Amino acid sequence: MPFKCIFLTGGVVSSLGKGLTAASLALILERQRLNVAMLKLDPYLNVDPGTMNPFEHGEIYVTDDGVETDLDLGHYHRFSSAALSRHSSATSGQIYARVIKREREGDYLGSTVQVIPHITNEIIQVILDAAKEHSPDVLIVEIGGTIGDIESLPFLEAIRQFRYDHSEDCLNIHMTYVPYLQAADEVKSKPTQHSVQTLRGIGIIPDAILCRSEKPLTQEVKSKISLFCNVPNRAVFNVIDVKHTIYEMPLMLAQEKIANFIGEKLKLATVPENLDDWRVLVNQLSQDLPKVKIGVVGKYVQHRDAYKSIFEALTHAALRLGHAAEIIPIDAEDENLTMELSQCDACLVPGGFGVRGWEGKIAAAKFCREQGIPYFGICLGMQVLVVEYARNVLNLDQANSLEMDPNTPHPIVYVMEGQDPLVATGGTMRLGAYPCLLKPGSKAHKAYNESSLIQERHRHRYEVNPDYIQSLEDHGLRIVGTCPPQGLCEIIEVSDHPWMIGVQFHPEFVSKLISPHPLFIAFIEAALVYSKDASHV
């Protein structure tokens, strides 16, 4: 087999941080001069998470080639340089759909279609396709869910078969939770033992066990886990809860020397990893930096994972400017919304769907425009800006988006050509990376280091109605970014405002700790200028 494969499974509890672990391993292996690819296998029956409630699932992360994926792919991107595409994510829904489609087309020649071998063969093909697409030295495969869940069984059986055929080229890391009982002042390894026992019962013997814990495990506990789980003592690794930031994770894994174990086990030709630049950034994040307050106005603010990439992009940009982003979640339905915004240095309205909270976001944009507070509207946040401007500057009182009011006499935001939200919702939006031409002299042009052509990722169905663009521009709302050749409105700026910008795309999806997105840097710069203004109380 031309590549090596690391399978990452989880046990005891969910939300262990497998995605962060996979991303951290990718970073370390890349620093050992290996080419790494990533694959997330999710056991849910949705074809993709695109139609799932953010409260239930968290944010939807979009790849360059227009695939709606799990938020873990955002972690993969922010930590590593692994190329992510439609071959980096698969769900049970996708896999079952492919098998059923082939059965309907007669591809199985009358055979009884079963989980084994048809579903498991399809899962194996997904793994092979991911490797073929990216040609990695190492493919890291994260299996969603928890060992013992019924829905994960086909994936685990596929992994068992894959390992059987390629035993020398595969490694399984099983991640577990080792709880600490405060009353007894001790950690308990029994849940880990039971989880490994369940995994072994499926036919998978882990090569290493990665123990997540609140406190460091003693050598005695590690030895106990080694003995009862039948793995070498040196293959029991421990990561404790991070103290300050998730970006500590690669440093913790490097300290455990897990990459050395992987290299020996898979016979990889590597060099020692150099994480010095990463360590510098993590140390900065751990300092008591001056804060910049950013109000994020949305309807899912109680669930931070719903805006994960937004929050991380703000953190990246603030750190680049020597500050810590203090993110103030503001519910778009909060009656005291403007009072809360008055205490912030800037406001960001992220993407979203639906009428709930819409008028609150309009109120936030109006308040920021009138008070000179820096405003960054992303996707829906840009549409909020345009509708507010039309209502209160163009005096089109009933201006609205067709999404919010299908009967509005002034559809400032309308459905894109070829889009019909009533026909189908899953995977039908304008998705993925598209080019954008920037207008010289604009704030956006300056932020992008005066590049004339950029490319950003999209996820939307509605756009600014071109019938109103001339009137908007005549009243001071500049269209400074357009998508060729149709000229779709991509970036807008308010001329007489210090920094009020809306973008139809999602810049947060490409921000990294080591390379913050330029628009977020410009936004934080504007917030810092505003915070120093003597008139800001």
Swiss-Prot record:
InterPro entries per the UniProt record, alphabetical: Class_I_gatase-like, CTP_synthase, CTP_synthase_N, GATASE, GATase1_CTP_Synthase, P-loop_NTPase
SUPFAM superfamilies, A to Z: Class I glutamine amidotransferase-like, P-loop containing nucleoside triphosphate hydrolases
Keywords recorded for this protein, A-Z: ATP-binding, Glutamine amidotransferase, Ligase, Magnesium, Metal-binding, Nucleotide-binding, Pyrimidine biosynthesis
Keyword tRNA-binding: no
Segments of this protein annotated with the region Amidoligase domain: 1-268
Positions contributing to CTP binding: S14, D149, I150, E151, K188, S189, K190, P191, T192, Q193, K224
Binding site for L-glutamine: G352, L380, G381, M382, Q383, E403, R461
Gene Ontology MF annotations: ATP binding; CTP synthase activity; glutaminase activity; identical protein binding; metal ion binding
Positions bound to Mg(2+): D72, E142
Involved pathway(s): Pyrimidine metabolism; CTP biosynthesis via de novo pathway; CTP from UDP: step 2/2
EC identifiers of the protein: 6.3.4.2
Highest taxon above the source species: Bacteria
Function description: Catalyzes the ATP-dependent amination of UTP to CTP with either L-glutamine or ammonia as the source of nitrogen. Regulates intracellular CTP levels through interactions with the four ribonucleotide triphosphates.
Name by which UniProt lists this protein: CTP synthase
